[in-house]
Amino acid sequence: MTKRVLISVSDKAGIVEFAQELKKLGWEIISTGGTKVALDNAGVDTIAIDDVTGFPEMMDGRVKTLHPNIHGGLLARRDLDSHLEAAKDNKIELIDLVVVNLYPFKETILKPDVTYADAVENIDIGGPSMLRSAAKNHASVTVVVDPADYAVVLDELAANGETSYETRQRLAAKVFRHTAAYDALIAEYFTAQVGESKPEKLTLTYDLKQPMRYGENPQQDADFYQKALPTDYSIASAKQLNGKELSFNNIRDADAAIRIIRDFKDSPTVVALKHMNPCGIGQADDIETAWDYAYESDPVSIFGGIVVLNREVDAATAEKMHGVFLEIIIAPSYTDEALAILINKKKNLRILALPFNAQEASEVEAEYTGVVGGLLVQNQDVVKESPADWQVVTKRQPTETEATALEFAWKAIKYVKSNGIIVTNDHMTLGVGPGQTNRVASVRLAIDQAKDRLDGAVLASDAFFPFADNVEEIAKAGIKAIIQPGGSVRDQESIEAADKYGLTMVFTGVRHFRH
């Protein structure tokens, strides 16, 4: 009995060659629309879909394959006489192979000028239906949705006259993943169109970007997936110019670093980061000086860290950076001379380019945190704050220099793991106290790191002080200005302690926990 294949593809890469090989193996080809035209033009003899259905394509191609002669040929179980008799009685010929890929919905909605009508018109109906029918009946039918699988199918057909069950099952699994992702993307698009912020079902679509050697530790398996609709300003979209593949920990740290740099748009800024915590932030009138400040913030912790810059890297800055062992450098661009310096002297240094012109769009993306048995979803901590809304709660007002430093510190503290404390001046971090289980321990840690650089320094806390002992420690160190959210039932005790020591303290009213 002659084998029959149905081919209907929007991605025509390799399809002519695939069909030609099937013809050599004696297969009969059914095809539709543009695919049939492409095959006919290449001299591949095909049968029109309407010759199989006995029904013309209609409604601009919306209705062409949704017919019993197609789906009966796909779904008939070869091991059930009743199915085969029903097919014979209804003059339905069996279809043994389906090659289908879908209307380019994703590519359509990524176009900057796409209309809602264009998006709707590129929702495939017949394609997913054929794929699912064939995949369901994979015991008898081979289904191909990915041109990358053409070769393995042809090899098995040439060698054995049919594909193996293992291959058919694997291809069916790929089809169900593909159609699920396709529908999920459509659901995501429609959900956004109607402004639904809390859908009762959440479907997310990601594509494998990079298999990883291992995860957070060598005993953990890991892979890196990218959103089906890419976020332009993200580590997933960064272009790697040099160095080894990014590791699991590299990617997490790099993501944390580029989130921080978003808050420092106005001036040349360098952020150094280690284990998801900033270890140095420097801000200046030029990027070379900003690097100097970031490095001086903590020249020990920056070793083996990640650095992100928000201005082009020039040769002078590159010369300074190459003398420090770094895992990753991320910047919007590099001069040719700077890139040559970094690459020539650091073969394994991971150098990434990430344009910073899409930062605001990245801020609206939700954050997902996996827990065993569930997923937490929240919007990012990107609330717009203004010093005009802050409240000075002490008798002493901040000086102009202190006010600038407090604003700098408040931007930085948002990215320190809770309980988080940071000590800064108006252009660089001086001490970081992250992740302690009591706040006074974080205060002591940050102050100890800042040590002899406390003259004119300010301190920021990501959450309120539960007791006045924090203020006591700060005053004892000689720091004169504090910024914190406020909101403790004992706020007055902290205010009185600040007044006692002549400190100025600002309440922002906004907490910035980071776990």
From Swiss-Prot:
<dbReference type="InterPro" id="IPR016193">
    <property type="entry name" value="Cytidine_deaminase-like"/>
</dbReference>
<protein>
    <recommendedName>
        <fullName>Bifunctional purine biosynthesis protein PurH</fullName>
        <ecNumber>2.1.2.3</ecNumber>
        <ecNumber>3.5.4.10</ecNumber>
    </recommendedName>
</protein>
<dbReference type="GO" id="GO:0003937">
    <property type="term" value="F:IMP cyclohydrolase activity"/>
</dbReference>
<dbReference type="GO" id="GO:0006189">
    <property type="term" value="P:'de novo' IMP biosynthetic process"/>
</dbReference>
<feature type="domain" description="MGS-like">
    <location>
        <begin position="1"/>
        <end position="145"/>
    </location>
</feature>
<dbReference type="InterPro" id="IPR002695">
    <property type="entry name" value="PurH-like"/>
</dbReference>
<comment type="pathway">
    <text>Purine metabolism; IMP biosynthesis via de novo pathway; IMP from 5-formamido-1-(5-phospho-D-ribosyl)imidazole-4-carboxamide: step 1/1.</text>
</comment>
<keyword id="KW-0378">Hydrolase</keyword>
<keyword id="KW-0808">Transferase</keyword>
<comment type="similarity">
    <text>Belongs to the PurH family.</text>
</comment>
<dbReference type="InterPro" id="IPR036914">
    <property type="entry name" value="MGS-like_dom_sf"/>
</dbReference>
<dbReference type="Pfam" id="PF01808">
    <property type="entry name" value="AICARFT_IMPCHas"/>
</dbReference>
<dbReference type="InterPro" id="IPR024051">
    <property type="entry name" value="AICAR_Tfase_dup_dom_sf"/>
</dbReference>
<dbReference type="GO" id="GO:0004643">
    <property type="term" value="F:phosphoribosylaminoimidazolecarboxamide formyltransferase activity"/>
</dbReference>
<keyword id="KW-0511">Multifunctional enzyme</keyword>
<keyword id="KW-0658">Purine biosynthesis</keyword>
<dbReference type="GO" id="GO:0005829">
    <property type="term" value="C:cytosol"/>
</dbReference>
<dbReference type="InterPro" id="IPR011607">
    <property type="entry name" value="MGS-like_dom"/>
</dbReference>
<comment type="pathway">
    <text>Purine metabolism; IMP biosynthesis via de novo pathway; 5-formamido-1-(5-phospho-D-ribosyl)imidazole-4-carboxamide from 5-amino-1-(5-phospho-D-ribosyl)imidazole-4-carboxamide (10-formyl THF route): step 1/1.</text>
</comment>
<dbReference type="Pfam" id="PF02142">
    <property type="entry name" value="MGS"/>
</dbReference>
